Amino acid sequence: VSQTSQSRRILAFPYSHTLSHLSRPLLIAIELQKRNIEVIFAGEKQSLFVKQNAFEMVSVYEPDPQQLYGNIRNGKLRFVSNDEVGKMIEADLELYRRVHPDLVLSDGRFTAPISAHIAGLKHVAIVNVSSTEYRALPYVPVFDWIPKSIVTREGRLWRHIEKLNLYLEMAIFNSAMRIFSEHSKKLGLKTNITATNCLTGKDFTLLADIPEYFPTRNLPSNYQYIGPLTLKADIKPPAWWPPKKRRGGLVYITMGTTGIGEFFRIIHELIQRTELTVVASTGGQIGDLSSIDGIIYLEEYLNGDLVMDMSDLVVCHGGNGTIYQALQHGKPIIGIPTIPDQKFNMRRVESLGVGKTIGCDEFVKRPDVLLEAIAYVTGTRVFAQNARRMKSLIDRYDGGRLGADIVERMLTVW
C-alpha cells in the first residue's frame, strides 16, 4: 500500500469478527475522512459496512471467533494460547510493513500495544472501562455474598473490599496469561502489558463509555471518556414497516451471536401466547422460521435506531454497544448475557435501575421468565424514567468527533 510523503495514514485495526469492535473505529474513521486523513482497515473478515463507507480493507490473520469466544464463554482465563499471541504479533508486524501507517487505531486487537512498540508506531485504542486496570467496579464481584445488613455498600469498609476484589481478579488474570508481561519485559516496554490492559493503547486510550455508567479510579491523563460509539446503520426499512402493534406493546429483540441454541424458535413460540408484538434482528440465526404479521417480525438485519425509537423495551445479550444504543433512545433493557463482559454490563444496568437480567440457563429451562420480566419492566415506570435520565447524560457526548480529535492530535505529537 503506497503512501505519499505528504499524506497522513491511520490503520484501523479492529477484531473484524465482532460488529461492535468494527463499528467503533468506523465511526471515528468517518470523521477522520472528512478531515482528509486516510484510513485503511485491516481484518480477516471483509466488512460490508467498511466498504459502504469507501474505506479499503486489507487482510490480516485473526484468532478464530468460535474458539476465542468459546474460551471466554467457558470462563477460561487463558483465553488464547501463547503460540497464538506470537502468531498475532508476527501478523501485526507484517501488516505494518505493508500499510506503512503513521498511527494504529485498534479495537479488540490485544497484541497491538506490543507490536506497535516493536514497530515504533503511535498507538491509540478504543476500549470499554471494564477492560482496563482503572475500572472502579470489580469484573467478578466475589464478595457480593456478604449481606448488606452486615456491610453496607455505601460505607468505607465496602470500598476497601471492592479494592481487594479488583486487586485479586487482576492478579489472577495476569498470572494466568503471563505471556503479555513476558513480552513486555523482554522488549523493555515502558508500560507493562498484561492480560488486564492488553486492549488499551500504548500512547492513548479512548474510553467508549460515560463515567456515570462505568466509573474509573486514578485515571491517567492519556485515558479519556469519549462516550459510546454506536453505528447508525444505513439499512432501509423492510417492506412490512411499520409493524402492527398489539395492545401488549412493542419489544425489540437483538441478540448478536447469542450462544443460546434455538433462541429464536423459543421466542417464536413464546410470543404467540401473548399480546406483545416483537421485532427481532436475527443475524441469520432463524433457520426456517418466518414472520407472523402483527405478532413477530423477523429480519436478518435491521436499522436498530429506527426500531428502538418505536419500541417500549429492548431485549439483548447485554453487549455494551446495544445497551448504549437502547439508552440513547431512553429505552429500558432486559439482558440475557452469555459471556463475562455481558454479565458485567448487565450488573450495571440493574444497578442503575434501567433494566433486568435473566440468566441464560434460567431462560432455557423456563422461557416464561422472559415474559415475566417484560411485564415487570414495562409495568414499573421507574425503569423508563431512569433510562431517559441516562439518555440525557449520553447526549452530552459525540464519540466519533471526540475520538477523531484525539487521533488527529496524536498524529502531530511524538
Can you say where each PLM-predicted feature lies in the sequence?
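Donor-nucleotide binding loops and adjacent catalytic segments primarily
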Residues: 29, 209-313
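Active-site-proximal region of nucleotide-activated glycan assembly enzymes
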Residues: 124-215
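Short, compositionally biased "basic patch" segments
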Residues: 53-55, 60-67, 203-219
